[in-house]
Amino acid sequence: MQILYIDASGDPGMYDHKNSKFYILGGVALSENDWPITSAYFNDLCKKYFPKEDLEEIHTKQLFNGRSLFDKIDHKAMVADVCNFIATAHLTLFGIAIDKDQFLIRGLGKPEDVVNRSLEEIINRFHIFLLNRRERGIIVSDASAEGFDTRIRTLYEYFRKKGTHFWTLTKIIDTIFFTPSQTAMGIQLADFVAYAIKRKCVDGDSSLFDQFAARFGEHNFRLIPDPNRK
């Protein structure tokens, strides 16, 4: 069985030049069989920089900027180690980045459709991944505001029961599960992936993304709208 952990970057509201231009979903999938050793290596990485205390969570933005707990360590070295970990561990990455302004200008949907589209896109790609591997999977999401979690669960249940525009979801089982990011290694890694996508799409800096871009494969990352299509 494969476990897909997902986390969002940015807000889904209409772009007004004061909020985030992109809404991004980052995803990290790993097999239940690979989970124990992957988790152990992840804990070893954290212990390398915090040998005397248990690091509750790698919060990517704080790590990248050397803030909070990360101001007393070589945070750039830790960023490099996390990138290498993602690039070399038995992980498959997923990413959906929606340019909210262009999404509306091109008539691809209404403001409230941004979340729907991003979730549908990442579910489609996870389903294809499971079909190709002849496996089943579950999805675990970072817990956020209660009302937003309810919206995501309602959307997910609709897709699971009725299918997406392209697939009947025969390989994804049960409901979507929510847990705080500090309790799940996979969500922290998904946060890192989402942040790398944000740096690439918003800031024009692909230095993080490029280090593990191969882990997305050919079809698991999508920018919406596709800038190469008119």
Language model segments and positions:
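Phosphate-ester processing/binding pockets and catalytic centers
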Residues: 1-230
